[in-house]
Amino acid sequence: GDTGPCGPCTEIHVDCRTDEERKAVDGKTLVNNDHPQVIEIWNNVFIQFNRKKDGSLEPLPAKHVDTGMGFERLTRVLQQKQSNYDTDIFTGTIAATEKIVGKKYMAGDDKESIAFRVIADHVRAISFAIADGQLPSNTGAGYVIRRILRRAVRYYYSYLDHKQPLLYKLLPVIAKQFENVFPELNKQLDFVSKVVKEEEDAFLKTLEKGLIKVEMFMSLDGVKLIYEGKSKEAHTLPGKLAFELYDTFGFPLDLTKLIASEKGLKVDEAGFEKEMQQQKDRSRAATTLETEDWITVNDIPSSKFVGYDSLEAKAKVVKYRKVSGKGKELYQ
């Protein structure tokens, strides 16, 4: 960041190329150059200064090393594999997926191969998170879990032609594999499986309809816009449609952007945010309550709590008032 603890850093890179490739091109020239076989596996930051707003550096009284290692990448290097997904971290999950969907993982750059890798990565992440106490939801960290899960569902639905819940069937494989280092998943396997399957069921009910909406835009609305000379609009998914996919069909915005990009479209994110804000405003207005004055019917000076000793008790209404909201009238 612009301010706060900082210091010089060093990175550890490994050249995973063949001897012939190393002789042909010096690995130093490929560091931090997005080469798939020359990878960073470790980073060390030597925290020793505090950077102030004016940019000056103030020495810290206590110094330390902030270190981070890429577990999957280090495993790849130690096991001498060409990809993280060729290591035994993922091969068991990929093999189990092959059996369920009846397709062979080809380890290529095609959509099917990518789907296998997305599923193997995402199902491990969500299963660990749920076992650790984070349930899928529509807000905060819970929504991150839901987004990851739904992205995996979309991949097996669209590219592995599998239309039934799949992820929950992979959990026993992961639980067994990691039982010595993360026993929590194995202990809560039934619960985590139930949560994941319910999430899959819920999204699968709306996924196809949402995908049809995108196809309709491309085949009908998009063609119409091109005919009208609005080529730019034809290649942009409207914010209103993106919000409908989110609100009605459960498509996270990042999933809609992924689907759109695969079809050569962009998403009107500003339009999406506008629709989102309008819905929040409507929701706030709808939850506004109007309360009338209290009406006293029994003048009782005090009451005694008896809940610690009894589950039932007779009582008298002391006072009440009318509460109006969402077109309804209630009394409290």
Name each region found by the language model:
Residues 1-332:
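A glycine- and charged-residue-rich anion-binding loop/surface
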